[in-house]
Amino acid sequence: MATVTSSAAVAIPSFAGLKASSTTRAATVKVAVATPRMSIKASLKDVGVVVAATAAAGILAGNAMAAEVLLGSSDGGLAFVPSDLSIASGEKITFKNNAGFPHNVVFDEDEVPAGVDVTKISMPEEDLLNAPGEEYSVTLTEKGTYKFYCAPHAGAGMVGKVTVN
């Protein structure tokens, strides 16, 4: 029987005798100092202008937003939701079929501000929004109170009112 033996010598380096180099050299470093192009006061003024412009844009966008009126309540009722609303002059109202019953939006010619032509703001009585999600939009500019109804369901109480300020 043969026996194999192996012996290896491993050398482990020792750092005990090493000393840190303490060589010092004089070095010259140029540092560029950035000079502000505007003063802090001018910078804060610019920030103020940006904040004011952003706020003004938000206010104007808020005035241009559309009001939404659902045609049919979530429980299937024949109603405009909301049935009474106030908007700013020039604000768009979007009437959206919520329930899938055929609905329309007709403004009552006797219940709008004087001089308003209801044929220009109403849907024709024979036109209907049949499917959920179908929409009709109108923008009212004349200040006053406008009453509207759904022609197929007015007898069931599907009426509404919008006040334009």
Swiss-Prot record:
Transit peptide residue numbers: 1-66
Q: Does the keyword Electron transport apply?
A: yes
Residue positions annotated to bind Cu cation are H103, C150, H153, M158
Q: What is this protein's function?
A: Participates in electron transfer between P700 and the cytochrome b6-f complex in photosystem I.
**CC cofactor:** Cu(2+)
- Where does this polypeptide localize? Plastid, Chloroplast thylakoid membrane
Q: Does the keyword Iron-sulfur apply?
A: no
- In Swiss-Prot or TrEMBL terms, this protein is called Plastocyanin, chloroplastic
What CDD domains is this protein classified in? Answer: Plastocyanin
One of the Pfam families matching this protein, by short name: Copper-bind
Family, similarity comment: Belongs to the plastocyanin family.
Entry keyword set: Chloroplast, Copper, Electron transport, Membrane, Metal-binding, Plastid, Thylakoid, Transit peptide, Transport
Instruction: State the membrane topology.
Output: Peripheral membrane protein
Q: Which InterPro entries match?
A: BlueCu_1, BlueCu_1_BS, Copper_blue_Plastocyanin, Cupredoxin, Plastocyanin
GO: which molecular function terms? copper ion binding; electron transporter, transferring electrons from cytochrome b6/f complex of photosystem II activity
- Domain of life where this protein originates: Eukaryota
Q: Which residues form the Plastocyanin-like domain?
A: 67-165
This protein's GO cellular component annotations are: chloroplast thylakoid lumen; chloroplast thylakoid membrane
Give the organism the record lists: Silene latifolia subsp. alba (White campion)
